[in-house]
Structure formats: structure tokens, C-alpha cells
């Protein structure tokens, strides 16, 4: 079926069910940013393939809301679908909730699958629409009823992460979380975030593309640990090891019946912004719900000593692979046909030559020319174009290794570039360098540093429509909270104090629709600096080890300090990566990291 046909089929079903508006978020049952094929309902009903967005379907209109990363892509993919694009955050554009409040009339019915909407959002919708006496239909998966060839739920084999990689045993992590439960006087801890469960139990999976997580729910008490998952995904030995730590595995969907039977008056700790509304609605009404951030969130974000050491090794391996790729690309772009897709395949080949490489940490973005202006462009067979010996190609890629997860962007010059391109290439690079060089007093959050990255662009009256940085997991999700770099304060997602061990991306960019796009990204590790009479000072350690392309830089735009920052970084890259290169690559890297 075409998107138009799917919309028509959904509207027929909505009429049968008495539903006036149907809400389709991107989420799975766990609030994941990226979802498995089974959960791609929003993609199915709209045709939009981006990782973020919400659809609303009514009898006479349909809308899609997405953020600035995807404005160009969404506009292109929605052509001819009758679906209207709402650019979230733009002046005059209503939010999904504002739209529903305006469009839904007295006593109408709003529908959604309660497993894909968080308890917090469901409560907000009920409060917002209560004055109109709006009813809610949340028990039916209407998309599932019309999606005849829907993929099955993923059931990939589970692996255990040895303590030499994790740095802390499962038993120690469990004990620490139970201590937190006791301090909060909680009887039950409900954990549904997939990366948090994987971190806590030192397990990894492959149930979401590029995200090494296991579809599961976890219920913890002071005596029990119940893991609800696909039992067949666990080898017998892993089951035995989990049971040795008190973890028993039950069928995935039985979690809903279990929470219904939680003892009367229990104090249940969970995060309403992450746990789905159907699960929370199944909890006995007389239970006391303690709505707090997951107890695992901060310990997961603060990498331990072993994880920090391993991440350094992962970034050396990744630096070797990406450096080899850039050398290969610049050497061969005029000699053979290289397309966006074939370049991505070649980079994967270089990464796969590294020991302990497990796969991409997200779908690679190899965007040439005008495609680079699409922030999260993803080449397909239909959009794939050849690279030429002119202009720039943006390569935003990453890998999973047993030693950790990487995420790097380099804008690579393939031939002549204009002064305009150099101007913005240099401004973005200055922002990257200035943020990474920050030294600060303990207690700062990511909000304190965003200006360092955006400043050179703001001086030009320019900006970019995405955050400057996100947290990165350890062999987990490449996007991990709560740390990040942004300038807007988000009340629902307060910026945490930056702690030693937090790993964050530093990725300013500039995008000119129809012309070019530039992004420079390194990962920086928060570290302690000296302690003085004024308190503890902190700094960032750059882990990414790949040269920035000197051919795109206008040194005259840079201060002496900024040039020194770049030269010092390039010296470290050369010293670190050279031992792993052949003679041709060494000679090339010597030139690529020369002083300016």
C-alpha cells in the first residue's frame, strides 16, 4: 500500500472504533530513541524515515512533527502524501499537544497505543484535554491492525559483557541500586529503559539496529530481580550466571500481569517520562508511585576507570580506521567511481579490520555536496550519488567495540572549495576547538559551554538547529543522557552537573540548504583538573584521534590560540595513529597534520 492507502485504511478503522484523532509517536514500549523494525509505526503510516517525529491522523488531515535535524528530509519524504509538515520549535508552529487542544472538539476521542506513549505524556494529555471532556482509546494498536506484513519482534542472541570491559560486576551494580532504593524507601523499582537494563546486568544484545540492547523489562525488589524478555534469546550459561546473581527470566509480555499483582500499598519507584502509560495504569490504584529519574541513569553516564581506559583504546582503533578511510578517499576519488553508499561500505571495511569491532553505532551518514545540508541525511539506492573531486563530503559515523562506542564527524575536502565554504568550515572548527579546550570549576553543566561552540557562528549571525553535544554510552546507545551541550534550558530534561567520566560529543555544524553542510565532531571525556582554594577544577580530554581537513581551513580567521589548539591536537593525532599505518598513509598523515 502507498502512504495514501495506509492513511485511508487507518481512517476506516478509526471510524469503526469511534476514534477522532490517532497519535503515532516514534517510540517502542520502552521509550527508545531508535526502535526496531516491529515498532516503526510512524514510518509505516507517514513514509518519513527520520529517527524523531510524531504523527497525528484525523479524518480530514494528517500532520507530522519533527525537529530541525529533519526539516529538509521530512519535506522531501512527505511530498504527495497529503501529510502536513509541522516544524517543531519554529515560530508560530503549534506543538502536538497545542494542535490537539485546538482541533479536538467537545467529547471527541483521542486514540493511541498506550504502550508507546509515556505515562507522563498520557497524564499531560488528560489534563490538557479534560476541559473538553475528551475520551481516550489506548488499548488498541490500530497501525498493527492494518500493517499486514509487519516484522516480528526481534529476538537476537544475548551476550554477557565481561568485567574486564564493564569495569564493575553485575552483583556490585545491583547492590548499589538496592542501596538507593532503601534510601528512598522504595519497595519496587520498575526499569524499562533498554540501555539501563543492559548496563545494570552487564548484558548486550542486538534487538535494535546499531543499539546493542535486549528487549526487556526489569522489576527489582529487595529480594527479587525479575527480567521480562524473550527467554529463547538467552543461552543456558547466561541464564545460569544471571540466576547466580538473583536474576530470573520471565516471558516478555507477562510484566503487565505482574505489576497488576504488586502488593497493596507498595512504594514503586519509576520514571513516568520513560515507563509506558499502559504499564503504569496496570499498577494497583492504592500503590504509591515515586516518580523519579531512573536510579541507573547517572551511574551509567559516569564511566568508571576501566570504561575510560577502554574508551581511549576504542578511539585509537577508530582513529586508525577513519584516518585510513580519509586517505583512501582522497587518493581514489578521481581514480574510481565512489558513491555515498560505497564510501560507507569502505569505511565499514576499515573498521572491521580492527580487533573487537562489533558493528556501526548508528547508520553512517556519508553526505556529499548539497546532501550534507540535510543534518541526518541517510543515503539510499534512490538518493545515492557519486563523489567528485570537488567540494566537500560530510562523514558522520561511529562504531561499537568491546572497548566502547565511538561517534565522529569529519567534513572532508575532495577538491576546490569556495571562500564561503572555507569561512564556515573554519568558524565551525573554531567552535569545536574552543569547547574542547574549556577549563571550568566543578558544578558547571553543559549549558555553560554551548556558547563556546556556537560563538564563532553567532558572531556571523548564523547558527545550527541541533544540540552541540550528547552523551555517549559504553557499548550502548550512541545517544545517552543525561549529559550534553545545549544552550536552551529544558525543564523536563534538566542539565546535570558534568562529572568526571561523562563522555559527550562536541559537534557544532553549519548547513546551507541547496549548497553544503559542515560538521566537526569529536568525543570529549570530562576529567578532573587541579584543586585549588577555589575548589575542584575540571577539563575535557579529547578521545577522537582523526585529523581535521586543513584544505578547508582559512588560518587567517583563527586566533593564535586557536591555531595552537589545532596544531597541538594534530600533533597528538600523528603521534598516536602513525604506528598503525603503512608508509603511504604515514606520509599522508604527516602532511594532513602539519602545523598551520
Task: Tell me the role of every PLM-derived stretch.
Residues 1-596:
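Active-site neighborhoods and metal-handling regions in enzymes and metal-associated proteins
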Amino acid at each position: 500500500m502507498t502512504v495514501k492507502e495506509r492513511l485511508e485504511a487507518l481512517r476506516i478503522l478509526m471510524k469503526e472504533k469511534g476514534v477522532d484523532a490517532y497519535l503515532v509517536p516514534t517510540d517502542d514500549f520502552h521509550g527508545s530513541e531508535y526502535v526496531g523494525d516491529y515498532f516503526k509505526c510512524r514510518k509505516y503510516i507517514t513514509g518519513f524515515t527520520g529517527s524523531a517525529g510524531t504523527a497525528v491522523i484525523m479524518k480530514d488531515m494528517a500532520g507530522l512533527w519533527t525537529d530541525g535535524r529533519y526539516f529538509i528530509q521530512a519535506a522531501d519524504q512527505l511530498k504527495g502524501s497529503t501529510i502536513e509538515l509541522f516544524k517543531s520549535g519554529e515560530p508560530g508552529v503549534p506543538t502536538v499537544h497545542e494542535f490537539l487542544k485546538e482541533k479536538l472538539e467537545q467529547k471527541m476521542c483521542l486514540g493511541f497505543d498506550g504502550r508507546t506513549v509515556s505515562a507522563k505524556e498520557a497524564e499531560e494529555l488528560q489534563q490538557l484535554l479534560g476541559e473538553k471532556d475528551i475520551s481516550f482509546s489506548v488499548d488498541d494498536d490500530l497501525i498493527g491492525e492494518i500493517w499486514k506484513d509487519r516484522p516480528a519482534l526481534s529476538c537476537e542472541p544475548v551476550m554477557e559483557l565481561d568485567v574486564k570491559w564493564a569495569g564493575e560486576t553485575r552483583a556490585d551494580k545491583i547492590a548499589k541500586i538496592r542501596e538507593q532504593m532503601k534510601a528512598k524507601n522504595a519497595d519496587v523499582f520498575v526499569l524499562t529503559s533498554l540501555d539501563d537494563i543492559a548496563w545494570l546486568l552487564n548484558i548486550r544484545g542486538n534487538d535494535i539496529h546499531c543499539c546493542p540492547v535486549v528487549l526487556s523489562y526489569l522489576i527489582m525488589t529487595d529480594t527479587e530481580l525479575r527480567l521480562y524478555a524473550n527467554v529463547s534469546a538467552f543461552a543456558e550459561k547466561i541464564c545460569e550466571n544471571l540466576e547466580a546473581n538473583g536474576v530470573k527470566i520471565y516471558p516478555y509480555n507477562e510484566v503487565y500481569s505482574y505489576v497488576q499483582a504488586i502488593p497493596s500499598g507498595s512504594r514503586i519507584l519509576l520514571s513516568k517520562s520513560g515507563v509506558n502509560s499502559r504499564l503504569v495504569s496496570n499498577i494497583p490504584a492504592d500503590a504509591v508511585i515515586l516518580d523519579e529519574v531512573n536510579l541507573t541513569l547517572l551511574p551509567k553516564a559516569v564511566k568508571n576507570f576501566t570504561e575510560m581506559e577502554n574508551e581511549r583504546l576504542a578511539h585509537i582503533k577508530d582513529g586508525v580506521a577513519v584516518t585510513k578511510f580519509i586517505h583512501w578517499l582522497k587518493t581514489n576519488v578521481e581514480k574510481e567511481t565512489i558513491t555515498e553508499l560505497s564510501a560507507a561500505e569502505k569505511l565499514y571495511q576499515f573498521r572491521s579490520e580492527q580487533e573487537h569491532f562489533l558493528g556501526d553505532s548508528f547508520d553512517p551518514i556519508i553526505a556529499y555536496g548539497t546532501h550534507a545540508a540535510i543534518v541526518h541525511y541517510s543515503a539510499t539506492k534512490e538518493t545515492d550519488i557519486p563523489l567528485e573531486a570537488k567540494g566537500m563530503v560530510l562523514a558522520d559515523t561511529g562504531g561499537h567495540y568491546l572497548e566502547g562506542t565511538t561517534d565522529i564527524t569529519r567534513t572532508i575536502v575532495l577538491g576546490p572549495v569556495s571562500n564561503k565554504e572555507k569561512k564556515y568550515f573554519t568558524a565551525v572548527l573554531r567552535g569545536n576547538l574552543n569547547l574542547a579546550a574549556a577549563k571550568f570549576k566543578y558544578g558547571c553543566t553543559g549549558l555553560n559551554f554551548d556558547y563556546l561552540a556556537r560563538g564563532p557562528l553567532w558572531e556571523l549571525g548564523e547558527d545550527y538547529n541541533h544540540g552541540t553535544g550528547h552523551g555517549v554510552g559504553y557499548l550502548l546507545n550512541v545517544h545517552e543522557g543525561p549529559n550534553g551541550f545545549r544552550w536552551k534550558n529544558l525543564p523536563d530534561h534538566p542539565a546535570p552537573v558534568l562529572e568526571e567520566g561523562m563522555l559527550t560529543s562536541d559537534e557544532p555544524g553549519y548547513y546551507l540548504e541547496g549548497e553544503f553542510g559542515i560538521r566537526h565532531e569529536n568525543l570529549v571525556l570530562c576529567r578532573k583538573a587541579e584543586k585549588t582554594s577555589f575548589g575542584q577544577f575540571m577539563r575535557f580530554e579529547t578521545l577522537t584521534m582523526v585529523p581535521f581537513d586543513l584544505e578547508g581551513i582559512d588560518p587567517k580567521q583563527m586566533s593564535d590560540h586557536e591555531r595552537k589548539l589545532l596544531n597541538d591536537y594534530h600533533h597528538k593525532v600523528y603521534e598516536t595513529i602513525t604506528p598503525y599505518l603503512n608508509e603511504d598513509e604515514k606520509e599522508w598523515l604527516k602532511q594532513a597534520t602539519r602545523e598551520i
